[in-house]
Curated annotation (Swiss-Prot):
Taxonomy of the source species: Bacteria, Bacillati, Bacillota, Clostridia, Eubacteriales
Source organism, top-level taxon: Bacteria
Protein name: Protein MutL
Record-linked NCBIfam families: accessory_GlmL (NF040745), glmL_fam (TIGR01319)
Pfam families (alphabetical): MutL (PF13941)
Protein's gene: mutL
InterPro entries: MutL (IPR006230)
Function according to Swiss-Prot or TrEMBL: May play a role in glutamate fermentation.
Amino acid sequence: MDAYLLLDFGSTYTKLTAVDIENEGILATAKDITTIESDIMVGFNKAYEKLTEQLEGKEVNFVKKLACSSAAGGLKMIAIGLVPELTAEAAKRAALGAGARVLNVYSYDLTNKEVEEIKNSNLDIILLAGGTDGGNKECMIHNAKMLAEHGVKLPIVVAGNKVVSDEVSEIFDKAGIFYRVTENVMPKLNTLNVEPAREEIRQIFMKKIVEAKGMSNAESFINGILMPTPAAVLKAARVLAEGTDKEDGIGDLIVVDIGGATTDVHSLADGEPSKPGVTLRGLEEPFAKRTVEGDLGMRYSAISLWEASGTRKLQKYLCDNTVDVEACCKYRAEHIKMVPETEEEIKFDEAMAKVATDMAMERHVGVIESMYTPMGVIYSQIGKDLLNVKCVIGTGGVLVHSKNPGEILKAGSFDMADATHLKPQHPEYYIDKTYILSAMGLLAEDLPDKAVRIMKKYLVKV
């Protein structure tokens, strides 16, 4: 039988999924520790061995082998723009949507100190924006010159004011910098245009980054490392929400991905105001939006999760005021491979997951603000209104292994005690039990209809 082999070179595990193309089913899944320090193929070969054992007795012909990766720290970027709330924020959103970890966002004219900071950062790509089309020219030219003069040699995606793109190209050509020019991330005030920059970032990731991270060994076995893992998850979520010409999507949805270091939230919805008389304010929101909370994680970021939430919030979800939450979080940060075994450990992990879901969702969704005027109260919305989203999908180890995944995801739903945050009110909850989201994002590149049908079949309602 013809099958696709879909790989995710994760930061901790290398995960393999074999998909029967004809019958639209998962044939087998396997995983092993990612071995980025030595040779990434060592961990892959161990996982592949486990996979072939499961496929014993079946005649499987892998017609395509596709991969995504977040190994070696994933795709690390910085964004540079003009105004923090506008072009710098638009650049950040483009980078996040491309599946990157955004290490920093710089605005206005770069200083010598900032450029040295950029130069010494462990980065993969710089996204340079600034000014609307026909707007401010000086800032982007200044920043391009600064990067060139300080000898920055990282790949740069230029996605700012189109009027200065020729001049910026000239600066980078003279300095021998690898760059790509694409459309402005904010061509008009408050108007987002992130897709061209996302695609350019993905192309550079495929060509340059995979090689730089010592992953070219894998390229000989597979057809290509197509994108960073978070971009694959976002792609899967998008095709599931929107559907294809031949297969209906399920409509607006949210994906919550709780990991050891971060909690990612992906929303696929236009987020327009659902209540009458509310006006939108601020930067336009993308239909496919991703936010990453680097301080909300189950292991690496356990201490920062406690610092961000405070003792009281964790104790609220634990329903126990006697637990030393600081000590429990510190232990997890120091023992990142810890697997909870006792009832107390499981309860504490689930309380952490609830805090991560609650806070990550709070930061992702829009807010309603009231303003008093002589005409009465006026309500404005900043960000996305996700009140009416009917589907929330959870993924990540703590959710997959939990006996109460629905309770964890409920922590991210609308709360009357905090009615200004526009979290989903009455959604249905699903779990990605077989870790297929990133795999389906890869499959959707070739066979989107099948990817949608497989997700509908394998996502488990809780």
